[in-house]
Regions:
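Bacterial N-terminal signal peptides
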Residues: 12-23
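Bacterial N-terminal signal peptides that target proteins for export
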Residues: 2-14
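Phosphate/dinucleotide-binding and metal-coordinating scaffold of catalytic cores
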Residues: 25-569, 579-589
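A general, composition-driven signal for non-globular sequence regions
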Residues: 1-3, 20, 202
């Protein structure tokens, strides 16, 4: 019996972890708004004027932008809990965006703009229900152009960066060292009187930004999210304008598929020198989640001046770090990030390998100034200490780690370079995605338990239709109950999310199957007619951690007839999900 309860707690813990990663629950350093906090701390900046809504001054990296959003509470509650789930976000055919616009008013540096479009943004790591990253589109509902040089705001919550400095300093370094990147500064964001903390105000990758960076904003634009130039994956690049055509990307893929790459032909499609600079800069800054290490967070733009593609960095909220901060991966950024297909192939060519080494040395000699970077960090830390949200308790320690990276980076890279060219240990990584392997349809009647119950297989009532890997699953016995998740531990001020757990015995082999599902706390209530809520979770075949045990993720929708987190209360509803398994991510270390 003790083993059964332990298995249940592990199950609820792991699917809750999935929920934390995908449904926007807060992390320990997340800046949740305090209902008692009515106003943002003051910066003692001079009174703003409408002239500040010119891109030239608006994105001044030394300026902290003031953004005050007013939106109906019902609309805010609707958009802030919209989310992607891990499995559906990473299926091979990417799902449509779950985010929708609502009408709002915004005051930016004292300039009032009414009837703008407001929506949540983010892929996975930055999703948050309480401090969401936001898009503000001026002309979504009304034909208006209140600003010069930009037509929308991109406000990133820096959820993965407790310093709030990574995007600001990274994009500045990219631009200064020759890679076109968005301009960026910081913003104090308030929604309906509640202070959400310090965000990054990042220039949107739209025609005004492209015009500023390249001199012409009319070229083809694609966004890359967990994708690379593999022949069968090209159309996972997201078209961002009407000029975007997949044919040149298919040609790049065909060239990179060859064992010996035709560099001259590739150079007709990709600006090789520009890419080498982008590649070396990603490596220098420790961009573990960028194109060359994780095939993620980038745009490619076909510059009309030469019809060649240039790379633009994006999602730069986790640079200046020695390791990927999420166990068990802990990938260490190195002198050469070579997991991308383009970097991997180019490093095998002596000519481009030599040019990469030369460019890294040039970056270190001409642009990487420890004195300048440390002065920027020190100044920003002093300015932000009174502005970061009180829940951001790791701010000081994170700034210390940021400084440590700056102080030690040159020595680490020079030591690696002194050892000679890196020997590649394998081919490029296959981008990670999920493949559907089954489905589950459930109707259930359960009870809420404040503590994990005894004999869970005998609890509740379950009607289930389940298929896994082509097998129709039959159960000898299956039970259900609902409780708070027990793991991972959350900060005291973060409520523990609800879970719905099914434990059953499979007829075919007597194996135990555990089905764990979770929803955001705000959605754990009876649903209205024709309404469904997002459901995420896992399926465990066998006992987790034991030989032969298999874990798969599930994603879908559900309804609640009854739902209350109170001992003995009824929890009843339906669940429709698909089962997925990971494919790709053959990382070579």
């Amino acid at each position: 019996m003790t083993q059964t309860i332990h298995r249940v707690r592990l199950a609820t813990g792991f699917f809750t972890l999935a929920l934390l990663l995908t449904a926007g629950c807060q992390s320990e350093t997340s800046e949740a708004p305090d209902s008692n906090q009515a106003a943002a701390p003051q910066t003692n900046q001079p009174a703003p004027s409408p002239a500040e809504l010119s891109a030239e001054t608006f994105f001044d990296p030394d300026h902290i932008v003031e953004v005050d959003i007013r939106v109906p509470e019902q609309s805010w509650d609707t958009i802030r809990i919209q989310a992607r789930d891990f499995a559906s976000a990473l299926i091979k055919q990417r799902a449509a965006s779950p985010f929708t616009y609502v009408k709002a008013d915004v005051t930016i540096n004292g300039v009032v703009i009414k009837d703008v479009g407001l929506r949540k943004k983010g892929f996975l790591g930055s999703l948050d229900d309480h401090r969401p990253s936001l898009k503000i589109k001026f002309a979504e509902y009304v034909d208006q152009s209140p600003a010069s040089g930009f037509d929308r705001l991109t406000l990133n919550n820096n959820k993965q960066d407790p310093t709030r400095l990574s995007q600001l300093l990274s994009y500045r370094f990219f631009n200064q060292s020759g890679t076109v990147a968005p301009r960026c500064n910081l913003a104090r964001v308030t929604v309906n009187g509640k202070y959400l903390g310090i965000y990054s105000n990042v220039e949107s990758i739209k025609p005004p930004m492209l015009e500023n960076g390249f001199g012409d904003g009319s070229g083809a634009l694609f966004e890359g999210t967990v994708v690379d130039f593999y022949v069968d994956s090209v159309e996972k690049f997201e078209k961002k304008n009407k000029q975007a055509d997949y044919e040149p990307l298919h040609e790049i893929a065909r060239l990179l598929a060859e064992a010996d790459v035709d560099l001259a032909a590739l150079g007709q499609l990709v600006d090789i020198e520009s890419f080498i600079n982008f590649w070396a800069t990603e490596s220098l800054l420790g961009f573990w989640d960028g194109y060359n290490n994780n095939q993620n967070n980038f745009f490619i733009y076909q510059d009309p001046a030469d019809d060649k593609f240039d790379f633009i960095p994006w999602g730069a909220d986790a640079l200046f770090q020695e390791n990927m901060p999420l166990p068990p991966f802990l990938v260490r950024p190195r002198f050469v990030n070579w997991q991308s297909l383009l970097a991997n192939q180019l490093y095998r060519i002596p000519e481009t390998q030599q040019r990469y080494h030369e460019r890294m040395n040039e970056l270190l000699e001409k642009y990487w100034s420890e004195e300048t970077l440390l002065a920027q960090v020190n100044s920003l830390q002093e300015r932000l200490t009174e502005l970061v949200h009180e829940d951001n308790k790791d701010f000081t320690q994170a700034c210390d780690r940021f400084r440590s990276f700056i102080k030690t980076r040159r020595g680490r890279l020079e030591k690696e370079m002194a050892d000679g060219p890196v020997t590649l240990k394998g081919r490029a990584k296959i981008p990670f995605y999920f493949r559907q392997t089954g489905h589950i349809s459930l109707a259930y009647e359960a009870r809420w338990f404040d503590t994990t119950p005894q004999q869970p297989e005998q609890l509740g009532s379950v009607t289930i239709d389940m298929e896994l890997a082509g097998e129709k699953i039959q159960f000898k016995q299956i039970g259900v109950f609902s409780e708070h998740s027990k793991w991972p531990p959350l900060p005291p001020n973060v409520p523990k999310p609800p879970s719905i757990v099914f434990i059953g015995t499979r007829v075919s082999d007597g194996e135990t199957l555990t089905l764990g599902f979770g929803v955001p706390i705000e959605m754990f209530k009876p649903t209205e007619k024709d309404q469904t809520v997002q459901i995420g979770g896992i399926v465990i075949e066998g006992e987790f951690g034991k030989p032969g045990a298999e874990v798969k993720m599930v994603s879908g929708r559900g309804t609640f007839s009854k739902a209350e987190m109170k001992e003995g209360s009824a929890v009843t509803g339906t669940i429709e999900v698909f089962i997925t398994e990971p494919v790709g991510d053959r990382r070579q270390e």
